[in-house]
């Protein structure tokens, strides 16, 4: 780890105090995570520090080329100078959350974040945390106008958490609130392409989808998928065996126009975590309810790359809000 820290510090160079430092380390350094921030803070200065362990790390090499490194020791550090920004960072326990039926003010007070100084949030969550969906729903409820980016950190076998905050390793969640003269605009490249029609959920138990409909036709998710498979190529059917996901409609995502359904919705890709061959049901890694639209998705690198490029080009077309920097959060 010391060598990785020296290399990162050498690339960043000596500079004044940054406003925000984002640190991401591969799980190859899991056992050394408690030493990481103290090592970095001896050489680099920032008002706020947060980050996470990841299965893959994205960053820029010494020669200026971007790289994504997976399943190998890697470290990425980003220092941001944001003059005029109102920044606040907090570490929160997720074991006891406010009631989702309570007031937005209760959630705001629990988080310790001021909604008047919160235009954007970076939200990182430990994979061992409880109530993850409730936490995200609560933050959306309490800060409806704040763009949120982030993800769930990667699990590991070391006896501590996966999140980095100030000079320590924590569990639960860490949140960086950004306001004032700065905001983060989120775009989502799904890494997948849709297959088959858009279905409506007819029956569901918690996160287990029991029945879907396509117009007047109703059937189990497995039966719907079998009909889709009949129209796929042999190569696509092979992809389904290891790269199948479910897209769940979200109407507040910024995606490219070709990723919108006929009603203008967008689909947030979620992992399928189980199939019941007895009743044809599927379990999905998200909370779903009857009436939601869903669509099966195949993971595809080219589709993700093209979509990301289109989104980034579109983000530069508004002359009144030209982007100054970009943050890439790669996770499902």
Where would I find each of the regions flagged by the language model?
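Small-residue-enriched flexible segments
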Residues: 1-20, 25-34, 39-41, 47, ...
């Amino acid at each position: 780890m010391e060598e990785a820290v020296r290399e990162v510090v050498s690339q960043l160079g000596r500079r004044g105090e940054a406003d925000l430092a984002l640190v991401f380390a591969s799980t190859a350094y899991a056992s050394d995570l408690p030493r990481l921030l103290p090592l970095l803070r001896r050489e680099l200065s920032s008002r706020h520090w947060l980050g996470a362990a990841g299965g893959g790390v994205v960053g820029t090499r010494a020669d200026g080329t971007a790289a994504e490194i997976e399943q190998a020791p890697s470290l990425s550090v980003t220092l941001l100078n944001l003059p005029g920004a109102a920044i606040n960072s907090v570490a929160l326990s997720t074991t006891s959350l406010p009631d989702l039926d309570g007031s937005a003010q209760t959630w705001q007070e629990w988080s310790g974040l001021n909604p008047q100084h919160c235009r954007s949030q970076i939200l990182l969550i430990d994979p061992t945390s409880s109530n993850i969906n409730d936490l995200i729903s609560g933050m959306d409820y309490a800060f409806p106008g704040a763009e949120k980016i982030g993800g769930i950190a990667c699990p590991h076998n070391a006896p501590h958490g996966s999140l980095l905050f100030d000079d320590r390793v924590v569990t639960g969640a860490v949140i960086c609130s950004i306001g004032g003269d700065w905001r983060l605009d989120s775009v989502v490249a799904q890494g997948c392409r849709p297959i088959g029609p858009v279905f409506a959920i007819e029956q569901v138990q918690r996160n287990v989808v029991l029945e879907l409909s396509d117009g007047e036709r109703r059937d189990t998710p497995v039966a719907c998928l079998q009909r889709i498979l009949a129209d796929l190529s042999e190569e696509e059917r092979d992809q389904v065996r290891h790269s199948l996901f479910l897209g769940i409609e979200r109407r507040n995502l910024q995606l490219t126009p070709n990723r919108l359904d006929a009603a203008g919705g967008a689909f947030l890709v979620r992992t399928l975590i189980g199939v019941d061959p007895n009743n044809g049901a599927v379990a999905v890694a998200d909370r779903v309810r009857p009436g939601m639209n869903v669509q099966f998705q195949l993971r595809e690198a080219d589709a993700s790359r093209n979509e990301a490029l289109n989104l980034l080009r579109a983000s530069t077309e508004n002359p009144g809000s030209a982007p100054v920097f970009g943050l890439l959060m790669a996770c499902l």
